[in-house]
A protein has these predicted regions:
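Boundary regions of SH3-family modules and the immediately adjacent low-complexity/disordered segments
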Residues: 1-2, 6-40, 49, 53-57, ...
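Short, basic/aromatic beta-hairpin or loop at an interaction surface
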Residues: 30-44, 183-198
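Short, flexible surface segments
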Residues: 54-62, 212-213
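Well-ordered beta-sheet/strand-loop patches within structured domains
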Residues: 111-113, 117, 144, 151-165, ...
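Second-shell loop/turn segments in exported
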Residues: 138-143, 163-171
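Active-site nucleophilic cysteine motif
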Residues: 156, 168-187
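...with weaker cross-activation on analogous glycine-rich loops/strands in unrelated enzymes
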Residues: 189-252
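Low-complexity, Gly/Ser/Thr/Pro-rich intrinsically disordered linker/tail segments
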Residues: 250-271
């Protein structure tokens, strides 16, 4: 087994035989990808039309680098993006399945210096840790906290119906913290991957009565995303759900989960 660390600061172990080792400059190139897949599952085709040969299937969250095209090619291929795959091949993906990457993936190099994640990311972006969230919100949402919160909730809803998979972080299966951290990531803010609040990351505890849409609700070993009006979205392994569903904090709501309400112990916010 090999110990690995993801670009969002998550440590784990992988069977070494499943890894492909590359030079650091190749990794830098990959981490400079400018597009992220937002469709649940999307084919990469050999041609910019549905008759193209299927080269591979990608999942939500996969990143790609757009390849340059001439003005004539771009016009002829309207509705499609020419992308570079990790194996060096190029293919085509529908534009509607892609969005700009809103998060920075190179802080992993600064983490080698022993910096906390926020400090490592700030060093990479040539800023300070306290400015990470305001700058992300300013860049992608015009400085509007409400717009950011709404976007996080919408990103989480895209996973509705996805089955629960412990350790999962894709449209094929996702766990509770995978759902919440992915929703934030797609909106430009990297939070801690597990179901807890720790120092060195953007999220901090706020009073329950101050919770707003987009905040995180913490239970022992579990986390959900608050949607507003008493409802929250989460990925749960409960037998009655088995995936991403919406439940409620309100006893009068048919989606009420009393077992979770009783053990809710913290609300987390990045604001």
């Amino acid at each position: 087994m090999a110990e690995v660390v993801s670009f969002y600061g998550y440590h784990g172990y992988v069977n070494q035989r499943e890894l492909q080792f590359v030079r650091e400059e190749e990794l830098w190139e990959y981490l400079g990808a400018d597009l992220v897949l937002v469709g649940r599952a999307t084919d990469v085709l050999s041609l910019p039309k549905v008759q193209g040969v299927r080269m591979m299937e990608l999942e939500r969250g996969d990143v790609l680098r757009r390849q340059p095209e001439t003005a004539e090619e771009a016009e002829a291929h309207k509705g499609w993006a020419k992308v570079l795959l990790t194996d060096g091949r190029t293919g085509y993906v529908r534009d509607v399945a892609l969005e700009p990457v809103k998060y920075e993936m190179t802080a992993v190099f600064s983490q080698r210096e022993g910096l906390a994640f926020n400090d490592a990311l700030a060093e990479t972006l040539d800023t300070t840790a306290d400015k990470l969230v305001p700058e992300a919100v300013a860049r992608w949402y015009g400085g509007s906290e409400d717009a950011f919160r709404a976007a996080v909730c919408e990103q989480a809803k895209r996973y509705m119906g996805t089955e629960y998979r412990w350790g999962g972080k894709s449209g094929r299966g996702i766990d509770c913290s995978g759902l919440v951290s992915s929703a934030y990531m797609q909106c430009g803010v990297l939070i801690y991957r597990d179901a807890k609040i720790i120092e060195g990351w953007p999220m901090h505890e706020v009073a329950f009565e101050n919770k707003k849409p987009g905040d995180a609700l913490f239970f022992p070993g579990h986390v959900a995303l608050y949607l507003g009006e008493g409802r929250y979205i989460h990925s749960t392994g409960a037998a009655a759900s088995g995936g991403v569903v919406i439940n409620s904090l309100e006893p009068s709501d048919p989606l009420y989960r009393e077992d979770l309400v009783k053990c809710l112990y913290a609300v987390g916010s990045i604001f």
